[in-house]
Design a protein with these regions (language model features):
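Conserved small/polar residues in nucleotide/adenosyl-binding loops
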Residues: 390-395
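Extended, polar beta-sheet/loop recognition surfaces of beta-rich domains
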Residues: 398
Length: 401
């Protein structure tokens, strides 16, 4: 059996203030083209279809186009979808019975009653049956009715749901899951585009994945194995943060042969409309580095000029049309970072601003600039004193209290 492993489409996502819907429509079209070429039996999508629980009409339309294009392929392709933590389980489940008749298998919610089990989809090839278990994002509160005792951790919740299943380990079994898996305490490599919970409470140990010949995982945005080679995060199809600059995005294609053999894994490169790039250097260097193949990319720019550049933002925007951020890294900015929080809090507001101005501009303020700052600071003090006078108790109030 051959299948594509996708996850974390995050359709409708914005990168800083840029709408990425055009890039997402483009990359999904390229995935369809790869499916037409490689002819997988199935496409597994391991959660976070959308970026928000209530996606826009445009985002829903883009995913509809993707499913329709996959459904039109010959030979037929089955699509298996689970909900991730960004998705609304009920919205993902909408029309799932009708869609199943068109080879689109959806699981929005994990089992929540004792009668329910994980949704299973079966395939048959020359080596026998392949069982695909569709396990959506699980929280302890979702599955608390499955047993009489308490379930307090994500690890307990996922383990409970999987161990209830009657999994035939003589067959080839695949799990599609969207959780934060760790291997003997080792966490996967993350990026800035992911939402993490404090204290590791979302961690699920990969030991629970042992019954499966392949675990198609979602939730982590960088492609990687976690523990065994069979446990894989495929990563996002696009770069969704500056921290992912330089990451090569791919479609994970997996072939399962006879039971007991390792899966054959191939990473099919994806070429985005726009890459995320980091550019570091003097203003003139970055302006001169502009070329037809990068001026439309998403760029994070760090300027290292020691002498203050004139209107750097305006100049850069004339060359690069998708600037994510402009930062300054030079001797002056590094000195500012050397101030401790206690030192900053102990400074008089006027003295603090004078120090800041001199460090940023390499000169003292002019008389006019000094007068403006003194007026602003004195005005703030007067407002604060008025507020204090207005809210303080009068002597009469104190005498009667």
């Amino acid at each position: 059996m051959k299948f594509f492993h996708l996850s974390d489409l995050h359709i409708g996502k914005q990168l800083h203030h840029y709408n990425m819907i055009a890039e997402q429509r483009d990359i999904l079209g390229k995935i369809v083209a790869l499916a037409e070429r490689e002819k997988p039996d199935a496409v597994l999508i391991a959660g976070d279809i959308y970026d928000t629980p209530v996606p826009s009409a445009e985002a829903v339309s883009v995913f509809d186009e993707f499913l329709t294009a996959l459904n039109d392929l010959e030979p037929e392709v089955t699509v298996c979808i689970i909900a991730g933590n960004h998705d609304s389980a009920k919205r993902i489940d909408f029309a799932s019975d009708i869609l199943a008749k068109h080879r689109v298998m959806i699981a929005g919610m994990p089992p929540v009653t004792r009668e329910e089990t994980i949704r299973k989809v079966s395939f048959f090839d020359a080596y026998g049956e392949v069982c695909i278990y569709l396990l959506p994002f699980v929280k302890p509160s979702y599955v608390r009715n499955l047993i009489d005792g308490d379930i307090t951790t994500y690890d307990e919740a996922v383990r409970l749901v999987i161990e209830r299943e009657n999994i035939d380990t003589a067959k080839r079994n695949i799990l599609v899951s969207h959780q934060f898996y760790t291997a003997a305490g080792r966490e996967p490599e993350t990026s800035d585009s992911e939402i993490r919970m404090v204290g590791g409470i979302e961690n699920v140990d990969t030991a629970v994945l042992e019954p499966f010949d392949y675990a198609a995982l979602g939730h982590i945005h960088r492609k990687q194995k976690i523990g065994r080679v069979q446990n894989r995060y495929c990563g996002t199809p696009l770069q969704y943060s500056v921290s992912e600059a330089g990451d090569e995005k791919t479609v994970t294609m997996v072939e399962l042969l006879e039971k007991g053999s390792e899966p054959h894994i191939t990473e099919l490169p994806l070429m985005p409309m726009r890459r995320v790039r980091k550019m570091i250097g003097h203003l003139d260097e970055i302006l001169n580095a502009a070329a037809e193949d990068n001026c439309h990319d998403y760029v994070s720019i760090t300027l290292t000029d020691e002498v203050e550049a004139y209107q750097p933002k305006e100049k850069l925007e004339q060359v690069y049309d998708h600037i994510l951020e402009i930062k300054i890294d030079n001797e002056r900015t590094r000195k500012i970072l050397e101030f401790s929080e206690e030192e900053v809090e102990s400074l008089d507001p006027y003295d603090a601003f004078v120090t800041f101005f001199q460090e940023m501009n390499g000169r003292a303020m002019t008389e006019d600039e000094d007068n403006v700052i003194r007026t602003v600071i004195n005005g703030e003090k007067e407002v604060a004193e008025c507020c204090l006078l207005y809210t303080s108790p009068s002597p009469r109030d104190l005498s009667t209290s």
